Amino acid sequence: MEAFHTHTGIGVPLRRSNVDTDQIIPAVYLKRVTRTGFEDGLFASWRSDPSFVLNLSPFDRGSVLVAGPDFGTGSSREHAVWALMDYGFRVVISSRFGDIFRGNAGKAGLLAAEVSQDGVELLWKLIEQSPGLEITANLQDRNITAGTTVLPFKIDDHTAWRLLEGLDDIALTLRKLDRIESYEAAYPDWKPRTSPVA
């Protein structure tokens, strides 16, 4: 996964609360066996409405989603994060995230930045007053900048570290490859073991 330090992109105001993972990507789109190509399913039931924000310019080119409270609740669905990223989002800002969504986001490289609800509403207002407004998320400083407005955001230290280092679960495991290989080399031959597939 690519390391995340800062990202600047067009802000997209999603004035909806309690957006669950089934609304982010309906189950019918989960049949792929790959980890990419889910952008068509993102907010699929809402995108059929021509007035939905992602159907409007310049928001259709946005990469910073500003959502209402309780974003990403519901079932554990990594595909929700993948769909957002496949569409082009790198940051989601909300006052509250579903716990599992927040964890999946950090493991995939999507920044889930938690700001106050007043902060979310201020960002909505700024974006709607100036469509195309660019928003910058700075993970090192843990702040969101929109024009002259600077808002702090919360993220747990471990997730911030993983994002800054670009460590998904596999990369995190590979940091201990020497210890894993030493363990495997010392493992008795008479015990059951797995063998690599040729």
Curated annotation (Swiss-Prot):
State the InterPro entries in the record. Answer: 3-IsopropMal_deHydase_ssu (IPR004431), Aconitase/3IPM_dehydase_swvl (IPR015928), AconitaseA/IPMdHydase_ssu_swvl (IPR000573), IPMI_Swivel (IPR033940), LeuD (IPR050075)
- Asked if the record carries the keyword Secreted, the reply is no
Molecular function (GO) terms listed?
3-isopropylmalate dehydratase activity
- One GO BP: L-leucine biosynthetic process
Pathway listed: Amino-acid biosynthesis; L-leucine biosynthesis; L-leucine from 3-methyl-2-oxobutanoate: step 2/4
> By its UniProt entry, which CDD domains does this protein fall under?
IPMI_Swivel
Look at the named UniProt entry and state the broad enzyme category this protein falls under. Answer: lyase
- A cellular-component GO term for this protein: 3-isopropylmalate dehydratase complex
The question of whether Lyase is a record keyword is answered with yes
- Per the UniProt entry, the Enzyme Commission number(s) are 4.2.1.33
A Pfam entry, by short name: Aconitase_C
Q: Write down the chemical reaction(s) this protein catalyses.
A: (2R,3S)-3-isopropylmalate = (2S)-2-isopropylmalate
Keywords from UniProt, A to Z, are: Amino-acid biosynthesis, Branched-chain amino acid biosynthesis, Leucine biosynthesis, Lyase
What is annotated about its quaternary structure and interactions? Heterodimer of LeuC and LeuD.
Name the job this protein performs. Catalyzes the isomerization between 2-isopropylmalate and 3-isopropylmalate, via the formation of 2-isopropylmaleate.
The similarity comment for this entry is: Belongs to the LeuD family. LeuD type 1 subfamily.
The protein in question is named: 3-isopropylmalate dehydratase small subunit
Q: Which organism is it from?
A: Mycobacterium avium (strain 104)
The root-end lineage is:
Bacteria, Bacillati, Actinomycetota, Actinomycetes, Mycobacteriales
The gene name on file is leuD
